[in-house]
Amino acid sequence: MAKNKGTRILITLECTECRSNLEKRSPGVSRYSTQKNRRNNPERLELKKYCSHCNKTTLHKEIK
């Protein structure tokens, strides 16, 4: 019998302010990788995380 793939999937969170902000501490885009349960959270995930490029806590959204 084949195994079930499971409900947890790997996602990437990207800083929303890095692309539009020109006054950054360093060039680049902050990204975090994490897991989410697709049954409990079917919509896109949004979390406040620390961005080392902006040097502050910003909103990070899920990307594909």
From Swiss-Prot:
The keyword Ribosomal protein applies. GO terms for molecular function: structural constituent of ribosome. Its main location: plastid. It comes from the Eukaryota. GO terms for cellular component: chloroplast; ribonucleoprotein complex; ribosome. Keywords: Chloroplast, Plastid, Ribonucleoprotein, Ribosomal protein. GO terms for biological process: translation. InterPro entries: Ribosomal_bL33, Ribosomal_bL33_CS, Ribosomal_bL33_sf, Ribosomal_zn-bd. Coiled coil: none annotated. Pfam families: Ribosomal_L33. It is found in: Plastid, Chloroplast. Signal peptide: none annotated. HAMAP family: Ribosomal_bL33. Belongs to the bacterial ribosomal protein bL33 family. This is Large ribosomal subunit protein bL33c. It comes from Phaeodactylum tricornutum (strain CCAP 1055/1). The gene is rpl33.
